[in-house]
Amino acid sequence: MKTLLRTSALLLALAAALAACSKAPLTVPLEDFSISVDAVGNTAGQVVYPKNAAQFDRPVVDVKTIRLSGQVTVSYTAVQAPLVMTFYARTADPGAAGCTDAGLAWICDAAGETPISGEYSFANGETQQVTLGDPNPEVLADGINQGRIWIGAEVTSGAATGVTFDFTQMVAEVTVF
């Protein structure tokens, strides 16, 4: 996720500067990237965030909304398939928000978190279209504007080991007004 955010932060800085000249949203293609996770298990009712926020340079112009869309291929060794999950994002430090410190990650009650996707069901090796920032595109924008963000997931069904998410053909739609 850090690769996505670093790449998108650079592109978004340019995009925000260009979009400031018009009121239309700007579409910015992002480089392909992968995220690997040792194991994913059922966390229904809880959102798991990485211990540290993704950090990057703030854009020169504040961003109002961001939506990321593209293809995701998920590969894993199933323990219980398929993986059904929803993605979340936050800009406030989970440690200061009453989340549980689980060593390598933060565990937060999903009821108090902000979803940035609908629910997705991933079969092993399947590729599908995903959108992050729908609903709540402003939380991604707030993270870009602050220069840090935590992106996590709630797994409502399934468990797997050796999970890899390959994000391809990703595009950021940016609005600055």
Sequence positions of predicted segments:
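Acidic Ser/Thr/Pro-rich low-complexity disordered segments
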Residues: 93-115
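Short, low-complexity, Pro/Ser/Thr/Gly-rich segments in the mature regions of secreted, periplasmic
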Residues: 165-177
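Post-signal peptide N-terminal segment of mature Sec-exported envelope proteins
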Residues: 29-51
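Short, surface-exposed beta-strand/strand-loop-strand elements in extracellular ectodomains
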Residues: 79-98
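A short beta-strand element within beta-rich, extracytoplasmic domains
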Residues: 62-79, 168
